[in-house]
UniProtKB/Swiss-Prot annotation:
Its main location: endoplasmic reticulum. It is found in: Endoplasmic reticulum; Golgi apparatus; Endosome. The keyword Transferase does not apply. Belongs to the LDLR family. This is Low-density lipoprotein receptor-related protein 1. Disruption phenotype: Leads to excessive accumulation of lipid droplets and restricted infectious growth in rice. Impairs the cytosol-to-nucleus accumulation of MSN2 upon oleate treatment. Keywords: Endoplasmic reticulum, Endosome, Golgi apparatus, Lipoprotein, Receptor. SUPFAM superfamilies: Calcium-dependent phosphotriesterase. Involved in endocytosis, fatty acid beta-oxidation and infectious growth. Plays a critical role in the accumulation of MSN2 from the cytosol to the nucleus by activating the cyclic AMP signaling pathway. MSN2 can then target the dienoyl-coenzyme A isomerase DCI1 and other genes involved in fatty acid beta-oxidation, which is important for lipid droplets degradation and infectious growth. The keyword Endoplasmic reticulum applies. InterPro entries: 6-blade_b-propeller_TolB-like, Cueball_EGF_LRP_Nidogen, LDLR_classB_rpt.
Amino acid sequence: MSTQPSHRLYILDTDLSTNVSTRHGRIISCRPDGSDLRTVVDGIKNLPDGIVVDHDRGLMYWTSMGTSLSAEGGSIERAKLDGSDHKTIIASGTVGVFTPKQITLARRSGKLYWCDREGMKVMRANTDGSGVEVLWSTGNAAEEDDRRDQMRWCVGVGVDEERGFVYWTQKGPSKGGKGRVFRGPLSQSPFSPDDVEVLIDGLPEPIDLEVDEQSGTLYWTDRGDPPTGNSLNCVSIADVEGVMNGTARGQVRTLARRLHETIGLALDKSGGVCYVTDLAGGVYAVDIKSGQKTVIFSELGDTTGIALV
């Protein structure tokens, strides 16, 4: 297991365990071994959840779910990697940011993709916040019954520009064993229901995901119950295309277990490492080949999203 010494991790701490009136969420940066830990953005009160870094432009984008998960109050924020020039690019009240979750960047097209959990949507926009598109919707955010139906909740998102697909998770009920991984064609907006595929179902509770386009591998975290939940997992996309869902589930490889409400992940493809966070404050490095798990931090905060630059 190796990584480049110049790499840095960017980690979100929601400060979820603190009362909202005194909450100080933050974005933390460190080297992959945990050294040189610093806070780059502080005082975030609205529950930051997903983060992605634009390497070429030196910018980071993150989602904030808002101060209350029962009200529409999310947003998408942007700043330079040192925390300066912080601005909101998609404001609260915009369709698709009810409670936005994981966010990713399609590097060829320069488009942002994210999932909106209680908004029940898969979304896309330009990096300046313009051109907001609803790619997939599973319910009406104005209807409380829809928002409470966790089978409708879209959470994790990944983009494979090589093969032309968007992948996302719908986590299902907490610890319910009804989580699913979907995909739809990048070329469509919105997706035609006939072209949306369920690749894997019956998962404990899948959360964030990432695609290794070169190897055609899908990675995701799962915060469901053991033995297959609270884990980091992967599957070859070719092995689950066009097969029955139960068979697809049997192709999944679990890389790491015994995580504690695991959320975020960030791939270092050249180093063969996947960095993972959990809500108990754990930050881990997992060797993709051996599955060896190294604890970088055991209690960093209430950690969610993570990105590598």
